[in-house]
Amino acid sequence: VFSLCSPLAQEQKLCPLMIEDEVDPEEFVEYKGKKIYMCCGSCVKKFKKDPDYYVKLTSNLLPQIEKGSLNKEVKFIDQKFCMVYADRVVSPKSYVHEHNGKKYYFWSSTAIRKFKAKPDFYIEKAKKNSNLKKLALKK
């Protein structure tokens, strides 16, 4: 539910961390003088751990952020989404688990536990994740 007093929330429809969830106008962070809306308090906390990364990664979902203001020093990790929760973005500061010599990033410790139980299933599932096109990243 959006109120008339939050015009930015009307422009930004989706949470930049849980990219399939609608924003809650009461859950937001200030970033370089702009309000970025989230779907919940958990996303607010995660966002604050790596704001420049999340803004650059999900700038396509944030119409209030000018593309020229993105931090050019931020380098993306290869993995963009949690291996278990495919609609949740990860950053270099996310939970990490190594499997067969490769690092994988996760939304939570619960996601790591699920991954450990069926790693091959989640690795195959991640290869089919269609959420990447929502980020519209330039190569």
Region locations from a protein language model:
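Bacterial N-terminal signal peptides
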Residues: V1-S3
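Intrinsically disordered, low-complexity terminal tails/loops enriched in metal-binding residues
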Residues: C5-K139
